[in-house]
Design a protein with these regions (language model features):
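Eukaryotic polytopic
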Residues: 1-197
């Protein structure tokens, strides 16, 4: 199951990195309202401020994540081959460098993705925050219809679901750690009865 989850995640990262279904999108602020256009020149012509190439940032996150997810495999193969060919010190060094790249690179990727996705331009491009004129139950459909070529709904939705899953996993992990700590404390205080070692 873990391998299936890894391969599925890697496949979606590759799809969104190399064949992203969302079109080019530039975010800009015009008179206090966010808007999306396919080119930066359109925003400059309209006098927009806070101009950001949202699509390129989202694609960069997927590309970074794709290679970040492949790094454990590539690092393991490189370390294994160098060890197999009689240079175990180099294999150990490659394994250590790969582990450092996996840990540090993964943390930076995770943080940058949150910043890019949940800043105002990312939330607007993904349809989380829409102009005041789009109200009611179908505001996302109205948003997608208003920006048919530039909305980042698909990429933004994938990123939001990914972060929701990781936050839930972090919460469960913290909860289990606290529960284990409490059980250990209770056992240390009350668990030592007669005949215990």
């Amino acid at each position: 199951m873990c391998c299936g989850g890894y391969v599925t995640f890697l496949t979606f990262l590759g799809k969104y990195a190399y064949n992203n279904p969302d079109g080019p999108a530039w975010y800009g602020n015009i008179a206090g309202q966010g808007t999306l256009t396919p080119t930066e020149a359109d925003l400059i012509a309209q006098g927009a401020t806070d101009i950001v190439d949202v699509h390129s940032r989202f694609v960069a996150w997927f590309l970074w994540g794709f290679w970040q997810a492949l790094l454990p495999v590539l690092s393991g193969v490189a370390a294994g081959l160098t060890t197999a060919f009689g240079v175990p010190q180099l294999g150990a060094c490659l394994g250590g460098l790969g582990g450092c790249g996996i840990g540090c690179g993964g943390l930076f990727w995770w943080i940058y993705g949150m910043v890019w996705r949940f800043k105002p331009y990312g939330k607007f491009a993904a349809g989380d925050v829409v102009p005041d004129t789009f109200q009611g139950d179908d505001y996302k459909d109205t948003f997608i219809a208003a920006y048919p070529l530039t909305n980042q709904y698909s990429s933004g939705n994938f990123m939001a679901v990914y972060y929701l899953i990781t936050w839930i996993m972090l919460g469960v992990s913290c909860g289990c750690t606290i529960l284990g700590f409490l059980c250990t404390c209770l056992y240390a205080k009350f668990g030592k009865g007669e005949g215990s070692y």
